[in-house]
Amino acid sequence: MDGKSEFKEELINYILLKKYGKGAQDPPVYSNALKKAPQEMFPPGLVDALDSYSINLSRSEGVEFLVLLNSLVNDIRSEEVKDIIFGMINTNQMLTKLMKDKKEVERFPDTCKMYSEQFKANKPLLKEFNAGSRKEQGNLEIGEPSENVVTRFPPEPNGRLHIGHARAALLNWYFASKGNGRLLVRFDDTNPEKEEERFERGILSDLSLLGINEYTLSHTSDYFDKIIDLGVFLIGEGKAYADNTPQEVMRDERGRGVESRCRSMDVEESKRIFKEMARGNASGYCLRAKIDMSSSNKAMRDPVIFRVNESPHHRTGDKYKVYPTYDFACPIVDSLEGITLSLRANEYRDRNQQYYWFIDNLRLRNRPKIHDFSRLNFENTVLSKRKLKYYVDNGFVSGWDDPRLATIAGIKRLGMNMEALREYILMQGVSQKTCTISWDKVWAINRKKIDPVSARYFCVQQRDAVEVSIDNTSEYTMDVPKHKKNGDLGTKEVFYSSQILLSQEDGRVLQDNEEFTLMNWGNAIVKSKTVENGTVTKMEVSLNPDGDFKLTKNKMSWVSKRGSVTVELAEYGNLMNDEDTEDLALRFNRNSVKKEYWYAESAIINVREGEVIQFERNGFYYCDGFLVFNLLPFTKQKRTGN
């Protein structure tokens, strides 16, 4: 699928909603939609046939599926089931390709007829769905000159970048790189209590992951002397004053538009106090801009522009005792650094008036153009830096790169391809519309990127693994392609032997005398199966070299007992639970990670940290360390059969 259609599986949800009033199904949509449909809607054999479906069918598997469907479609009486099957075919690249292949369609004429009828019936809905999908795509046009643009990305070095920051970073990078522009990465280091040099290194690493490597680096602290001078200038203009009103009282007064008792303070007295603040001797005072306490825009009600803070700064040490607020420093440094385009989240929109008040009243020559955009919100995702910091600092998670966190480093360890992330974020454009995004859409693009370049391996769950004896083979090794459709990935050495392991789940499915397929090997026939207390303990099988894998229902992954390697497979979930409490400790989801141990084929020892692979019939995994793998979200596959 291309960038505009990778979410087409949502078509099934759209049809079910419009025609049958059904609520949206979670991905995989087709599978969950089928589960929710009443079983009496399915003629005999159809459920098993649909079980062989996968979004990533090979050509031979696609033909097999359509041929199998051909023998059953005329018995389907339910329009809802027909529509689900229509959606399954319509959103599957391989199946739609086969439906247009004149040589192949002769093998499944009834399937083609059913599909054609449903296509005609659903044509109006298809048009609506596709039109809606186009509207959802953002654009990157803001009506500003595209040449010599200078943008800035100003992160605070008090944590790592999360996916929300990624949008701001990439939009600033995009507009700067369009035509001879420049991007400035400026660390907003105005709060020495929270900021550390290690976070600067981490943020630069995050930007590198996003592919942002060309920029000019600066710090707000580079301009502290100039910013302080401008604070003094504002006092001299009668447009700033020192204030020792208690914080809670000040908050209440600003909310009600009540002027501070300090607002009429003499200019020289404010200068004297500000000088003492700069020495760290005026505890309890701040400096406020004198703007308009009656303004309907609360951002204009005499905002604080300097605070005393005696904590040592990670760059300037104890040189300064007074620090500017972000709202005061930002327009100053934007102007001084020659920024032409200031891209900001629209949550700051009420501060735009304040931003330009500072530019104008400080008589700064360069006046950047502000363009704001909506934040990206994601379902069940914590983007509050305060909450993330709490869980990191208190040991609930392993660090800022924990896979449960939506930080750039965290989702990298979940197997996110950064090119896919860039593509998705830029596809949202500079929209003003705030919306909540489902992660499955992002991971759908990710799968499109990783699937063609991920090597394939087998693994079997250790718990109650079934020992299988093969009575007509010997031990040997053979080189097998790591990916049948991508020879560039090379080969792996597979060890074949008379003693292999199957998962308990697969062992239970196989019946006595059943012919099944051992993937990457051939067909085999079950000779005997030993079951103790409901658990399959061992099996005996014979290889059938003349068997046709196209005729077997069950295709099983396996590993040789000798040479198998134990791997840790981790599945990460949501960071927080649904408890109705403000206590972050109680909100932590203590079931947010599940770890299991599996036997993997011996070639797995060659997989290096950072690689993404597929354990076939299981899911895609990110190698998080030697023999440690993290499941990529929305890639877990059905185990039994197929």
From Swiss-Prot:
What's one Pfam family the UniProt record gives for this protein? tRNA-synt_1c_C2
- What GO terms describe the biological role, i.e. biological process, of this protein? glutamyl-tRNA aminoacylation
The record's EC number reads 6.1.1.17
Localization terms from the record? Cytoplasm
Identify the residue span(s) of motif 'KMSKS' region: 382-386
The protein's matches in Gene3D superfamilies, at most eight in alphabetical order, are given as: Glutamyl-trna Synthetase, Domain 2, Glutamyl-tRNA Synthetase, Domain 3, HUPs, Ribosomal Protein L25, Chain P
Keyword line:
Aminoacyl-tRNA synthetase, ATP-binding, Cytoplasm, Ligase, Nucleotide-binding, Protein biosynthesis
Signal peptide from the UniProt entry? none
For the motif 'HIGH' region, give the residue ranges: 157-166
* HAMAP family from the UniProt entry: Glu_tRNA_synth_type2 (MF_02076)
Q: Which family does it belong to?
A: Belongs to the class-I aminoacyl-tRNA synthetase family. Glutamate--tRNA ligase type 2 subfamily.
Query: What's the protein called, per UniProt?
Result: Probable glutamate--tRNA ligase, cytoplasmic
